[in-house]
Amino acid sequence: MLMPRRVQHRKQHRYRTKGIAWRGSTLAFGDYGIQALEPAWVTAQQIEAARRAITNAVRRGGKVWIRVFPDKPVTKKPAETRMGSGKGNPEYWMDVVKPGRILFELAGVREELALEALTRAIHKLPCRCRIVKRERPGEAAEEEAS
């Protein structure tokens, strides 16, 4: 499971997600990717489930890049606990995802297999996503000509 090795502060505020992602919104490594279309809190468990779905679909071929990292702790108080007495203990880790953020990238596999693998991974994520494909410089000109 993904989580930070060390953190400066064990507990953080739960802030509201505003705006769209400017950084991390384009494909940087692979040929295909998953892009978030709405804001979400993606937990470490959801990231791991999506990663497993991709690796199971592509088997040995291809390379997967995880472009998000769960660095925000989410605290929770025990059940049937009275109000007050401080903030709860960290329960799990998550990442705040803004619309437009690339979550996963994939390279080294056929297009049909990549679309199948990324579709499986999208079903594991808590927000609406779309599959994006890297545009090659010559591809757009070829499509317009035909």
UniProtKB/Swiss-Prot annotation:
PROSITE patterns: RIBOSOMAL_L16_1 (PS00586), RIBOSOMAL_L16_2 (PS00701). GO terms for cellular component: cytosolic large ribosomal subunit. Disulfide bonds: none annotated. The keyword rRNA-binding applies. GO terms for molecular function: rRNA binding; structural constituent of ribosome; tRNA binding. Keywords: Ribonucleoprotein, Ribosomal protein, RNA-binding, rRNA-binding, tRNA-binding. One of its GO terms (biological process) is translation. It comes from the Bacteria. Binds 23S rRNA and is also seen to make contacts with the A and possibly P site tRNAs. HAMAP family: Ribosomal_uL16. Part of the 50S ribosomal subunit. Belongs to the universal ribosomal protein uL16 family. This is Large ribosomal subunit protein uL16. It comes from Thermomicrobium roseum (strain ATCC 27502 / DSM 5159 / P-2). The gene is rplP.
